[in-house]
Design a protein with these regions (language model features):
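Active-site groove signature of glycoside hydrolases
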Residues: 127, 170-185
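Conserved, mostly hydrophobic/aromatic
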Residues: 124, 176, 226, 361
């Protein structure tokens, strides 16, 4: 009841704030041709003239086919997405319009992201209720989420999509980060449901079961490697599914605005079935660029981590790198795309100036260099028109893939 009341108050506050559009703005934020009954995103159009062309022999849908089997995965540049599924629409009635205005960090579906070359995904399952289930034992399910907003796709449906792509493109692999996004306090059955889904017979052989720091591309082709932000065993002593867990501290500028490069470079990854199997993890996830100082910090820490990654990937040490481009200038789709439009050109310039690979780089607003769309807020006054933004995300993806040329066959 308290949670429902909170949602209602949040919706009222958001509608009041978002309803402050001037009359002159209505023509550009609302078009009768786009029905407000649509569930999530209105795609008004994309001008996809990509600034930096993909000029490799294999199609981008199968770009890993160019990489040697013996190449270590940790030595590659791997493009990915943050809050991968927010381009799939939200689940809760009425509230979905509020979340459309606050929680969208992607405007492309999972299928589009896979086809555009993304190989790292941010998957956030939470315990939810299947209102259509007739069997009480099947009422609780895992639905994907971004914070408190539940998405219109389940954990199982997401894995099914990943599996279908890998069957059609067996040269590829995926790395998927797991976390329970709205906290564990109400997620008592989270690991039980996680194990229930991951152990389904239809997924036999789909997941990497014997991760090592130096695992190779050949060993991962056709498979999904699960990374958890935390050790799941204290939550459920019986949970021993092959998931790699990470020592992944938060980087919230509201708590500590200063950068801490040493802490970013002293994280770790562990094989959950054998914690003596361990890798050093370089992790950068400074996720709020809500002031000029924080934007400068983000730009500095992303580029600095790219330079550290190049130094690490040429050594014999199997160091893993996850360097997030993603962040937000405000809690809205405009906030995610503004950060991307400010940061991605600097990352692109660095990739053009320096050779070498840079690890995993998750981004927002993937698959497009120019984004032009309407976000559905449920009324003409609360719809948001995003136009004139150039995140250059697909150009960034092309450069990341092309930086792997030293590992090509």
């Amino acid at each position: 009841m308290i949670r429902k009341l909170f949602y209602a108050l949040m919706a009222l506050a958001a509608m009041t704030t978002l309803g402050s559009c001037e009359e002159d703005d209505l023509e550009k934020v609302y078009d009768e041709a786009t029905s407000l009954d649509a569930p999530f995103l209105f795609t008004e159009g994309y001008e996809d003239t990509i600034a930096i062309a993909y000029d490799l022999p294999a199609p981008i849908t199968d770009w890993l086919s160019m990489v040697r089997d013996d190449a270590q995965v940790c030595k590659l540049s791997i493009p990915g997405t943050h809050d991968t599924m927010t381009g799939m629409g939200f689940y809760q009635p009425v509230l979905k319009y509020v979340f459309n205005m606050t929680a969208i960090s992607q405007v492309s579906t999972l299928e589009e992201q896979m086809a555009c070359g993304m190989r790292f995904f941010d998957i956030r399952p939470v315990v939810s209720i299947d209102t259509l289930a007739t069997d009480p034992k099947e009422k609780q399910i895992l639905r994907l989420a971004h914070g408190i907003s539940e998405l219109d796709v389940t954990f199982e449906e997401a894995i099914d999509q990943l599996q279908r792509y890998l069957k059609a493109h067996p040269s590829e692999f995926f790395i998927a980060k797991l976390q329970a996004d709205n906290g564990m306090e109400n997620q008592n059955n989270w690991t039980v449901l996680l194990d229930k889904v991951l152990s389904k017979p239809k997924y036999e052989g789909l997941f990497v079961s014997d991760w090592r720091p130096d695992i190779t591309v050949g060993e991962m082709r056709g498979k999904i490697l699960w990374l958890s932000r935390y050790d799941l065993r204290p939550l459920n002593a019986l949970f021993h599914f092959p998931v790699v867990y990470c020592d992944w501290p938060d980087e919230d500028p509201d708590i500590d605005e200063a950068l801490n490069p040493a802490a970013q470079r002293s994280c770790a990854m562990y094989n959950m079935n054998d914690t003596t199997v361990r890798a050093t993890l370089y992790k950068q996830d400074y996720y709020k660029t809500t002031s000029e100082l924080r934007m400068r910090n983000k730009q500095q820490t992303v580029v600095d981590m790219m330079h550290s990654a190049r130094e690490a990937t040429v050594t014999a040490d199997p160091i893993w790198i996850v360097n997030h481009c993603s962040a937000y200038t405000e809690v809205s789709p405009r906030g995610y795309i503004t950060n991307a439009a400010n940061l991605h050109p600097l990352v692109i310039a660095d990739l053009q100036q320096h050779d070498g690979t840079v690890g995993i780089m998750p981004m927002d607003m993937a698959c497009h260099d120019y984004v032009h769309c309407i976000i559905n807020g449920g009324t003409p006054y609360t719809s948001d028109y995003l136009y004139g933004f150039h995140p250059l995300s697909q150009s960034l993806t092309h450069l990341l893939i092309m930086s792997n040329k030293p590992y090509f066959k």
